[in-house]
Amino acid sequence: MKSEKPDSLTPVQWLICVIAVIGFAFDTYELLMLPLIIRPALEGLGGLKFGSPGYNQWRDLFFYIPAISGGIFGLLGGYLTDKLGRRRVLTWSILVYAISACAAGFATSLPVLLFLRCTTFIGVCVEFVAAVAWLAELFPHPKQREAVLGYTQA
């Protein structure tokens, strides 16, 4: 039996795409905010002067450690997504991401802020993996799946 190529998305599929775009926009926002907040954070929480060795060291840590932790847990997220299910992992990763990002606003020291940035990146990276896998499952036709994944992440 041949499966027919769908001509367009259903209203529910459009809603899923819109929600995915909004979610990916928040992910991008969160990941790209660091260059804007790093200087005030290091000066305010650490009392560090711009360009000093301590400032440069903390700046580097804030850029590299969260990225490494997010990358490692993103790989682990793929495994967890397969084992525990896309929806469950997606839900928990969004909670980790949201709680960590909110708590980071109340950080009182640089180590606490760094830890919360790491957990935020972990949540974002795991959420991204789970969301892409779930979108791929929801759109079984190859051309439609390619278009949906491309447009929602653009």
Model-derived segments and their meaning:
Residues 1-154:
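Transmembrane-helix signature of 12-pass secondary carriers
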